[in-house]
């Protein structure tokens, strides 16, 4: 009986990354983590899967429909994480709530949603973000937006991205004054987030629908003031937004007020913001976040205010590629070590060169020297280090500079001279 060969392809909506792509991804990871650390944020990591109920209460209808949900062998309902805020809050409630506050956390992780794959949208994707626990002051909101702005400003050219800042407390406060419950508020926010404003009229009575639409289509502070006049909670939310906006302008953060920013998650309660890169087209939103003062308590923890944001890692990388902002690579000396003899000394020589800061790739397939040198050229290496029986016996290596063609003998006890060839 013949053997049946099986062709296995990667799942739809996932990707394989080449070495060149991984260099770019690691570059962006290092950049983001350096910025996070410079602001005092400490990196955390949570499990790739959680109990599904963690997301079922507060993540919103759209995410619920897109979650990867399964049961384990004991029948427990689990889900691959579709986003990271809820897991970080769960972790905070379990182990971190006794730490000094405000507590500033950061992460870069993969998430999963069953979406229709397209440019900038995958079923496995990466998020980078921060969360601040323990401050209800506008300074915390300002820092989260300002930090995100600096990240984009440090990578993309001036004018390549837009910062839009809004406040869900205005819409929620307005609807609350009309006796509209949280469930309907969430539905309205989802409709606004998707731009389906006509549907709002079918969901709400005439007057609150008119006022809500006046808020989310407003183009100025005065238009919102008129729409929420006499609605105390909404007025306070507008004041909070203007305080945040004024501080952002003083901090040099170019932004626009956008009262239609609603986000797609049910847990947002106050300030919300998004960053868009218009040149990316339909998938232009690259970051977003906001305040979620009730989520910690709703997930079984203390009454602790919080604010955070998440960056679409893959989309930011796309934007960096679009504007040719990804560095070619770090400056390093790279060599192919070509052994012409079998000896454990080969690994000792390679180790010594690595200690000098070289990247040393040992040729392990036994290629003829001509083919090995051709390989080194194709890899665009700087040097070939040739080790044969005579070299080992006399205590030296032959070092060939692949850029100049110069080849010299370098004593084993003076390998630091190899870079001078």
Swiss-Prot record:
Query: What is a single Pfam family found in this protein's UniProt entry?
Result: tRNA-synt_His
Q: Which GO terms describe its biological process?
A: histidyl-tRNA aminoacylation; L-histidine biosynthetic process
- Which InterPro entries does the protein's record reference? aa-tRNA-synth_II, aa-tRNA-synth_II/BPL/LPL, Anticodon-bd, Anticodon-bd_dom_sf, His-tRNA-ligase, HisRS-like_core, HisRS/HisZ, HisZ
Broad class of enzyme this protein falls into: ligase
| E.C. designation(s) | 6.1.1.21
Keyword Cytoplasm assigned: yes
* Annotated family: Belongs to the class-II aminoacyl-tRNA synthetase family.
- For this entry, the protein name equals Histidine--tRNA ligase
The beginning of the lineage is: Archaea, Methanobacteriati, Methanobacteriota, Methanomada group, Methanopyri
